[in-house]
């Protein structure tokens, strides 16, 4: 099946921040694959549309819904795969929509954990990176969440992907 903007799951809905202080109506796209995300981004760029990306919607201050900057939202909830646990190098490869709670369950099966563990079962990797969250007492010993990232693939508005690695 050919993928185009019409084949990507989407809906008009009322979205709310985690603390329910921010609400807005939005067109929400739910890409299931990287190529669907690329199609959405290219369309939005071509048509000069502003948008906001969200994952778990756990931001206390409304950042998870864009605080009325745009009425187009791209939800990463379906881009949530735990791709690999590399035991030799102590590295986990996941997509941005992966929930911290799900990752911790898989890590526990392999006798691993994470240095920075934010509270809340719906917090996603993408949100944790975007907010550079900290876990209770972890920032004193290990730094913030961003300090544990070894590499990051970022898709830009034009659909191109760039890898950023720790120096």
Q: PLM ranges: what are they?
A:
Residues 116, 121-122, 128-167:
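FAD-binding subdomain of flavoenzyme oxidoreductases
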């Amino acid at each position: 099946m050919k993928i185009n903007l019409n084949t990507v799951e989407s809906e008009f809905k009322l979205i709310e921040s985690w603390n329910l202080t921010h609400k807005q109506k939005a067109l929400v796209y739910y890409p299931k694959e990287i190529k669907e995300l690329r199609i959405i981004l290219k369309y939005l760029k071509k048509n000069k549309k502003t948008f906001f990306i969200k994952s778990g919607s756990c931001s206390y201050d409304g950042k998870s819904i864009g605080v009325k900057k745009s009425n187009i939202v791209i939800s990463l909830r379906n881009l949530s795969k735990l791709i690999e646990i590399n035991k030799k190098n102590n590295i986990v490869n996941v997509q941005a929509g992966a929930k911290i709670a799900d990752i911790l369950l898989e890590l526990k099966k392999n006798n691993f954990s994470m240095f920075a563990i934010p509270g809340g079962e719906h917090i996603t990797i993408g949100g944790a990176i975007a907010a550079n969250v900290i876990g209770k007492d972890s920032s004193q010993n290990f730094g913030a969440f961003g300090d544990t990232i070894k590499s990051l693939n970022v898709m830009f508005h034009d659909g191109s992907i760039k890898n950023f690695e720790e120096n």
